[in-house]
Amino acid sequence: SGNRHKGTMWWQWAQRAAAILFIPLLVTLMLQYWGGNEQELAQIMEVKTNPGMMTSLTLPDGTLVYLNSESTLSYPSRFDNDTRNVTLQGEAYFEVAKNPEKKFIVSTSHQSQIEVLGTHFNVEAYEKEDRISATLVEGKIGFIYKSNDVSKKVLMDPGQKLVYDSKDNKVQLYATSGESEIAWKEGKIIFRNTPLEEGLRMLEKRYNVEFIIKNDRLKGDSFTGTFTNQRLERILEYFQLSSQIRWRYLDSPDMKDEKSKIEIY
């Protein structure tokens, strides 16, 4: 009876596998029938995250990607060319599979790119923002940007964070442990002497809200702390205890607004 049970399980698995494989196989056979020996073209895949949500995925070459809130990653179903090209709008953490023969290139907004062979790094490049940042955890990357229509490359070492301002066309490098920049993929928010504006930007992405700072004097405040799966109100209460900050939810006159607005005063 044990062999019969194993045989039944195998047959059920085979049926499921056949169901999964059937459509791709049918498409391949049709392409071969109509297109002779022409190879099937790689499809462009796109993964999007909703506000306040995160996801992870594995690319065809084995590269692991964590995608942050309101982000989009586009990539081919196969890396057939000499380079592995993906396009990012938003924020992602990459653990790139090593392949010395094929560079891994991340295209971002403002005609900039990040070029790697095999490494771990974080990229923040939201289309609506003028700022792009890259934090290198392991390996080596090159940040490529255009200045007066000339391509320039900045090489980075582990423990460095690059910030590119597309308005001023300036690049700055900072030393960092990377702890704060990549905490989001573990569901954490880490502030390390983080300025108020930067901290609020992090909270906007995580909780799908919009902050309005009414008191400019508060912009000089900075905060240190670690939060794991905390309610937004709990974090704002911590801000309130640590400084003179006060906050309140605003009623939106536009019912189409998807984001709650919070005034900092």
Task: State where each predicted segment sits.
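A residue-level detector for the "anchor" residue at the start of short, highly conserved motifs
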Residues: G2-Y265
